Amino acid sequence: MAVCIAVIAKENYPLYIRSVPTENELKFHYTVHTSLDVVDEKISAMGKALVDQRELYLGLLYPTEDYKVYGYVTNSKVKFVMVVDSSNTALRDNEIRSMFRKLHNSYTDIMCNPFYNPGDRIHSRAFDTMVNSMMMQVC
Amino acid sequence: MNSELFTLTYGALVTQLCKDYENDDDVNKQLDKMGYNIGVRLIEDFLARSNVGRCHDFRETADVIAKIAFKMYLGITPSITNWSPGGDEFSLILENNPLVDFVELPDNHSTLIYSNLLCGVLRGALEMVQMAVDVKFVQDTLKGDSVTEIRMKFIRRIEDNLPAGEE
């Protein structure tokens, strides 16, 4: 479904980024990088009070010619960014939402792994498998 | 008690040991030792709470361990299989091990026996009821096996602490 999935730390450095191998990886790095500004904008656009009770899912961040970029920010300011092919119109908002929820749960499990130090890059087989399953479904 | 808190506490303990000791063997030994110290205390609590009497043979002991002790302290009931022909050795199969809920072993700790504490607990507890046993992990889901298997081998009865002249 997705062509690129990234997890960004609170301080805006990447914890995890993975894209479909057939495409130019660097391009996705740029796309994700650019999307972070939109994420910040979306959060700061909301009032202080709203930030506390906002939804984690930010919705569509911006569409480009070929892709749509979606965002999700946890309460600990960890950001998930997902790039989806725009030709894939079958993908509903609800499905994106549930994919983010899955991603979030998986991320929580990693945080609970005693061998993972918060802030490190994510190297986890379980997480890889989960991300792969999300990217596979398209093709 | 909340199971995540329990799992995370045990995880913190093991990772701290990994930081303190250079190689995995030392960590395994240390876990076993800590488990032993827990076991010798835990058996008193177990006997007081469970009201089980003396076991007549090792098979009965296996049942008590799997069906009562594991259930009481970890909330799981391992199955007992692979009895040796002599009846002095068996395996406990743990379908899921609450200690390893979130754990993924990193590549540089391939010889770490993450749940080795359990072996120590079993050894310590049985020693207090006059049974010397050998306990070790033979399969572990963390290492890619489909189940976790703990092998227990009865070595001998400990009789030396009976005061002379009695019985």
Swiss-Prot record, chain A:
Signal peptide, first to last residue: none
Pfam family, one: Sedlin_N
Listed SUPFAM superfamilies: SNARE-like (SSF64356)
Places the protein is found: Cytoplasm, Perinuclear region; Endoplasmic reticulum; Golgi apparatus
A single cellular component GO annotation: Golgi apparatus
InterPro entries: Longin-like_dom_sf, Sedlin, TRAPPC2L
UniProt keywords, alphabetically: Cytoplasm, Endoplasmic reticulum, ER-Golgi transport, Golgi apparatus, Transport
Record bears the keyword Transport: yes
Domain of life where this protein originates: Eukaryota
GO biological process assignments: endoplasmic reticulum to Golgi vesicle-mediated transport
Primary localisation category: cytoplasm
Keyword Repeat: no
Family label: Belongs to the TRAPP small subunits family. Sedlin subfamily.
Role, per record: May play a role in vesicular transport from endoplasmic reticulum to Golgi.
Name of the protein in its database record: Trafficking protein particle complex subunit 2-like protein
Name of the coding gene: TRAPPC2L
